[in-house]
Amino acid sequence: AKKHNLKLKVVSATSTNDVTSVLAGLTGKVSGLYLPTDNLMASAMKTIGQKAKTAKLPVVTGSIEMAEDGGTATYGINYYDLGKQTGKMAYDVLVNHKKPQSMAVETSKKLHLYVNKANAKSIGLATNQIKQP
């Protein structure tokens, strides 16, 4: 954040009912939102997306699905691809009888940039301004 001259403000919501009031408290005080992959945030994405759109705030999310549901963009894991990778590991254990403790820990092999073009346009962002790091 320092490198890009950004100030962070950390907030949380304990239920979907809290989301609207938390967002109202941020309006006019932040330039954008980052939402990690979280079940509560994912279930509130339609509300978050609509409130952020009204406030013209970009929303960077932790997953493609959250960006599709109201976020602006994400650079992260594609859970479908991760599921296929996990399936291959399970196959090695179940069919090839590999011992899990002998297998290397794996992380997602590829990160994906996803831009919700309709959302970006609605808040005044040109999609060519959004680039992967």
What is each PLM-predicted segment?
Residues 1-133:
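Short hydrophobic alpha-helices and adjacent helix-cap/hinge residues
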